[in-house]
Amino acid sequence: MNELMKILGQTGQSVTFDQIKIQLASSEQVRSWSYGEIKKPETINYRTFKPERDGLFCARIFGPIKDYECLCGKYKRMKFRGIVCEKCGVEVTLAKVRRERMGHIELASPVAHIWFLKSLPSRIATMLDLPLKDVEPVLYFEKFLVLDKGVCESDQIDSYKNGKKRDQYLLDEIRCEDLLDEYPDAGIDVGIGAEAIKRALSSYDWGIPNDQERELSLAAKEKGLPDPFDYDADVMEGDSEKTMMRKKLRKATSEAARKKLVKRLKLVEAFVESGSRPDWMIMDIVPVIPPELRPLVPLDGGRFATSDLNDLYRRVINRNNRLKRLIELRAPDIIVRNEKRMLQEAVDALFDNGRRGRAITGANKRPLKSLSDMLKGKQGRFRQNLLGKRVDYSGRSVIVVGPELKLHQCGLPKKMALELFKPFIYSKLEKYGHATTIKAAKRMVEKERPEVWDILEEVIREHPVMLNRAPTLHRLGIQAFEPTLIEGKAIQLHPLVCTAFNADFDGDQMAVHVPLSLEAQLEARVLMMSTNNILSPANGKPIIVPSQDIVLGLYYLSLEVPEYRETPDEAVIKDGKIVTAAPPAYSDVAEIESAMLSGSLKLHDKIRLRLPTIDAEGKSVRQTILTTPGRALIAQILPKHQAIPFSLVNKQLTKKNVSDVIDTVYRHCGQKEAVIFCDRLMGLGFRHAARAGISFGKDDMIIPEAKATLVGKTSEEVKEFEQQYQDGLITAGERYNKVVDAWSRCTDEVQAAMLKEISKQVIGKPTNSVWMMSHSGARGSPAQMKQLAGMRGLMVKPSGEIIEQPIIANFKEGLSVLDYFTSSHGARKGLADTALKTANSGYLTRRLVDVAQDCIIVEPDCGTERGLTVRAVMDSGEVVASLSERILGRTLSKDVIHPVTQDVILPRNTLIEEAEAELIEKAGVESVDIRSVLTCDSRVGICAHCYGRDLARGTPVNIGEAVGVIAAQSIGEPGTQLTMRTFHIGGAATRGAEQSMVEASRDGIVTIKNRNVVENSQKVLVVMSRNCEILLTDENGVERARYRVPYGARLMVSEGEAVTRTQKMAEWDPYTLPIITEQAGTVEYLDLIDSITLVERMDEVTGLSSKVVVDYKQAAKGVDLRPRLQLKDASGNVVKLANGNDARYFLSPDSILSVENGAEVNAGDVLARIPREGSKTRDITGGLPRVAELFEARRPKDHAIIAEGEGRIEFGKDYKSKRCVIVKNDDTGEETQYLIPKGKHVSVQEGDFVQKGDPLVDGPRVPHDILKVMGVEALSDYLVNEIQDVYRLQGVKINDKHIEVIVRQMLQKVEILEPGDSTYLIGETVDRIEYEGENQRLMENGDTPAKAMPVLQGITKASLQTQSFISAASFQETTRVLTDAATSGKVDTLNGLKENVIVGRLIPAGTGSVMNRLRSIAASQDRQRVGGASPKAVEDAAE
């Protein structure tokens, strides 16, 4: 073969490359690519169907139509290859050169490239330092541009303009003629069109060599002479545009001018560095892409289908030829100008149709697809053909359940297998001599001869196939199985992998793919086999868990039913006689089985069993255990291991318990045992689910007896609230909230009563089936049972508000017409949401993958000392995520010290496995410092120590693992389960009652932090501190729970008091913010002027009035009203507070006064209250939109304002619509001002002391502020907790490290504060890695390094600003990214995954990372052999 190649020469060479550069092309470059100029708009001859000469499909330019055959047919066959036919001018070669050869069109007049004109910010306009709206009229021949004003003064030209200063040298035609007539000899130079712009661009000294200068300097270099055009020399730099702008920047005073200069300077520097000349943005020549990429295809019926590009090119050629003729004919200026404008528009449409003006449409009124449209969007080149391709050797079919399969198998229909493995079968048939030729083999297969089936069996043996179910939301959506041949036409799937595929058997389809090469088969077997994917990559818990009927079977098997007589565990003996016999004893499982067959023993009876177990030394011992026959059957299939005791299954097995059992088996006995155990467990579950025959009827849904009383009690409460409202004690908003609360509580109580009743086990009656299904985790949830047998409860309007009239009936009792009407509302909204949700969730996943795709494990250890401090997550006193859960599988960044003995329990850099986590938990350590990807110091990618354990394998992570993509999938995959809103189970509201008290969640001893209380007139303690917390400790003083107590709450416990579970410790009104006095005294109103700042509001319903503070519209000039209350003592002096300030209380708008002017008050009394109702009826953004909001780092509406430093609060002078709050530091005397809109409630009072990060105005916090004030660790804490809250609400577990990976990607950029001696500009955002490298270089040279602060970017913005322009272009805003990259001459080093997929190489992760490393070692060895580098340097390069 090689000899043949040598003789024939190679057609298209393939070249290896390491990076791709994108740059503007000069006209010379375009000519060098081209194989000839296209002069005619014709495509093919209508009679002969041969391409026209010099036309768009010309064979002379682009190459022959048939392999090795010229157009006229004079030369045919291989022997003439390379000859150019003298008659038709076609080179005799392969026809595929028509995919590679380009042509060009020489333009009669230059045109601007629309990308650089209209892609904002306009590059051409910025380089000329003109606004875009001045450049456009010049380009499209509406106005003239004065290029050189000659000897005229500016004001002389100004008089000819339209009187505006701005459009610097733009004149319309008439004024231009007048000006030239008036000053004929002044040397004024005016121009119009792209030529003028091109001349303007060339007139600057950019400090970039042009083509001739380049050639001369190259020639000089070859001769060893100094470069005559050395642009780096300071001499040249003297007056280049760049230097002048740097000078201007130093002198710039206003921020706006600085910003404008910086913008232009950056662009100029980009051009200078890339070596592209700005005048190349104006083209003299248009390249024409190869004809096979814009084909003309004959349809049947003699018509042709063509690519839109041909139409667009034809317009350009037509207009260009017409323009040439007009110029030759010396046509009047106005005609030529019009033709030039039309040419400009034609070229615009070719490059980007519709970017300017109306899009050019084809015959069917549809806009033509231009070159830009070919790249853009889901159907563009990037996403349609480069990132996602269709593959051969695949098939798809419906799936059915295959319960008799082993975990690593799948059933493949014979017909399908025969088709998929055809080539393999052909080769085997030939090998065994059944067929002599491939053709004969083909015929045998078509006839389906018996020997074909035998060979198919052999071919398929141990050849894995991959099954995929769309949508593939995470990597477990494609897994490999060994096929077993089955009859029928459906694929059989193992039931245990359904969770991973999210498959069910209601008509789902799956695709089969065959890995062909040996390497592919190897990877499929080692990495993708279903038996290798037992754990979920999202949380490290088993994903191969039984569900539905298997769980039900196991639950039924492990039930323990109470008996008529209460059998004690041991025999009761009185006076030497056995009064009550002990449960019967059995020696082994076989004995039990025979007893059950004979009917003397039931599945759920109590028995004693002598069971062989393995003790700590690994010896086998027998011990007697109290259990049931069912549990003994389960124990029989448990692997024998000392860490797996019988007690693991000697309990009621719910889905969660089964999962824990599988987890334990996997951790202790390894993968193989776990897989075998899972298969056996599945068989057992199915068998007993069938034997149990569990079913339920209407009477199994038991309506609790307590329901009527509970509903009655709540109705009374609601009437009471109504009465309070009528009496004017509460506002309408408060009444609504209280009613909703009461009904929520009632619904919960009914549900609890129903669950209690339904789960009762009565002797002699079987366990309730509905309860079994729900409790075991097989099907149904308490929320659904509540609607069946409890009460449906509150419903939701589509707007998210809760309808205060609940549905008291349940489905068993039946709904009335009104009930049905109320509930149809929310139920429909739920369905509509589901449809929207899927698309949104998919888009979130796509953005996450894009931002994290180049996060790969690159080295074992980066050696950093930094880390994050982690503690258990508490939510209203409950531990939501324990410390051990959060640190499992992470590496320690500091030693863990025992809190009591102060010994080092574990040294730093220990990977925390289950045993270590237990050790830390037992020692009572409160917080642990762990390494995190956020603090990893690796330059590219992440190191293995900072990442920790690979969750899907349970081992330390391997180098080359694509952790970014795994993180993105883990966060995106549950996205579809997250609601769009936080409620809906068939429209039912699940907003719990608003928290209005703190109950102890366990027994313990009370410690109160930040206790600041006063006793009010009712002798109740009222909390005055804004960050008071109640801690519950156990007898060893270890904190077990922590509760936040708000300002104004009534405290019911004292320091050191012992409390019991569910004891009330504090309560408060959840719907108002009180303002409470700390001292006794007489109230005095200040600036509370009737009908200006204070109004009496009448309630229409109750006829009662209340005094409300209003936001006054600016009173008379110079009057600064600040409504407030102050306290005076008996002698009329202002009362002083404990901190020495006067007792003054500022009132924000909407406060309702609770005291009259001159009233006597005691400490702890409420002076005024601010209703909170507005914030609570609005639905809190929940679910998916909340996750997206956090990842996009958006500023929430009505966000909190946080203090940037500590200090005391003072109120400054108010402005028209803002209040001024000053935080003054006592030590430094530094003051920070915050302007707060008047309508917002300021949550601090004058004289309060605030810490850094405390809120001055309540509301959701802004991530950017947290980063700026508190730093990276606080930000990561906030984001991780907020995102986890959303997922926890849905019961989805995701490991923190996945969120950290994404946050790391969001923090890739820094903003320059001081440039030092670097070339950076103030306010510029640069890549963190680049910035650190630059600073290192500066410090090595003894220069001042730059200073910068980290910037938080949303995931979309971060993806668009990655180092790789290929990856960014394939994500979004393709044209903008490519325009940007071209101006700065960007180089893509192909580090991420997407870029490599696009250019068609192995991705640098997984197996590909090894190949990459080997390639770089080989390359550096080559360099060493050539250049003689030291072996040490080569090793460094390989590292």
Curated annotation (Swiss-Prot):
GO terms for cellular component: DNA-directed RNA polymerase complex. Its cofactor is Mg(2+); Zn(2+). It catalyses: RNA(n) + a ribonucleoside 5'-triphosphate = RNA(n+1) + diphosphate. Binds 1 Mg(2+) ion per subunit. Binds 2 Zn(2+) ions per subunit. It comes from Gluconobacter oxydans (strain 621H) (Gluconobacter suboxydans). Pfam families: RNA_pol_Rpb1_1 (PF04997), RNA_pol_Rpb1_2 (PF00623), RNA_pol_Rpb1_3 (PF04983), RNA_pol_Rpb1_4 (PF05000), RNA_pol_Rpb1_5 (PF04998). InterPro entries: DNA-dir_RpoC_beta_prime, DNA-dir_RpoC_beta_prime_bact, RNA_pol_asu, RNA_pol_N, RNA_pol_Rpb1_1, RNA_pol_Rpb1_3, RNA_pol_Rpb1_3_sf, RNA_pol_Rpb1_4. Zn(2+) 1 binds at C70, C72, C85, C88. DNA-dependent RNA polymerase catalyzes the transcription of DNA into RNA using the four ribonucleoside triphosphates as substrates. GO terms for biological process: DNA-templated transcription. Its EC number is 2.7.7.6. Zn(2+) 2 binds at C862, C936, C943, C946. This is DNA-directed RNA polymerase subunit beta'. Belongs to the RNA polymerase beta' chain family. SUPFAM superfamilies: beta and beta-prime subunits of DNA dependent RNA-polymerase. GO terms for molecular function: DNA binding; DNA-directed RNA polymerase activity; magnesium ion binding; zinc ion binding. It is an enzyme of class 2 (transferase). Keywords: DNA-directed RNA polymerase, Magnesium, Metal-binding, Nucleotidyltransferase, Transcription, Transferase, Zinc. Mg(2+) binds at D504, D506, D508. The RNAP catalytic core consists of 2 alpha, 1 beta, 1 beta' and 1 omega subunit. When a sigma factor is associated with the core the holoenzyme is formed, which can initiate transcription. It comes from the Bacteria.
